[in-house]
């Protein structure tokens, strides 16, 4: 029940913007993630952009039933970067892949940027320095990508079991 309430209120918690490649030769989400991990892009993010979606879900639950990655979900902390210049998402997207442009209605997304408006992001840093969005953000990304079976599997992992 709490999950349904959260999904119904999602626009109040975060905003999303999709990007697509109209060149006819889109890069694989894995390639885009590798580019994001390069030092110059990581520094541009000022620790305010984390990986979510299928990549994030797999970070938290390696056994999740996923075949491939349909897109790269990024989560930007709108309250991060105090003392730093604000992150220009369009600049970051252009550096990831110059062919990525804001998607029009009905176009598939190669990258989706979700902007968090809450006070704390709860990002987790992996051993390689990659920031991952928290489990709830990854769950919302799976739902938004219409990966319902995987979202339910991930939700089950997140739901504490009561001892009977």
Regions found by a protein language model. Give the residues of each.
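Short gly/ser-rich loop at a beta-strand->alpha-helix junction or flexible surface loop bordering the NTP-binding
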Residues: 3-115
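C-terminal regulatory/effector modules of DNA-binding transcriptional regulators
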Residues: 79-164
């Amino acid at each position: 029940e709490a999950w349904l309430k959260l999904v119904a209120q999602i626009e109040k918690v975060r905003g999303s913007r999709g990007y697509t490649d109209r060149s006819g030769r889109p890069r694989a989400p894995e390639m885009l993630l590798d580019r994001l991990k390069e030092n110059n892009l990581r520094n541009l993010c000022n620790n305010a952009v984390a990986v979510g979606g299928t990549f994030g879900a797999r970070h938290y639950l390696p056994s999740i039933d996923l075949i491939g990655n349909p897109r790269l979900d990024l989560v930007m902390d709108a309250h991060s970067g105090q003392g730093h210049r604000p992150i220009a998402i369009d600049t970051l997207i252009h550096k990831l892949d110059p062919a990525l442009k804001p998607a029009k209605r009905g176009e598939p997304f190669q990258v989706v940027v979700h902007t968090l408006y809450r006070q704390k992001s709860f990002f987790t840093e992996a051993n390689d320095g990659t920031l991952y969005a928290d489990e709830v953000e990854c769950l919302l990304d799976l739902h938004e990508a219409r990966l319902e079976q995987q979202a339910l599997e991930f939700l089950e992992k997140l739901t504490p079991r009561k001892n009977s």
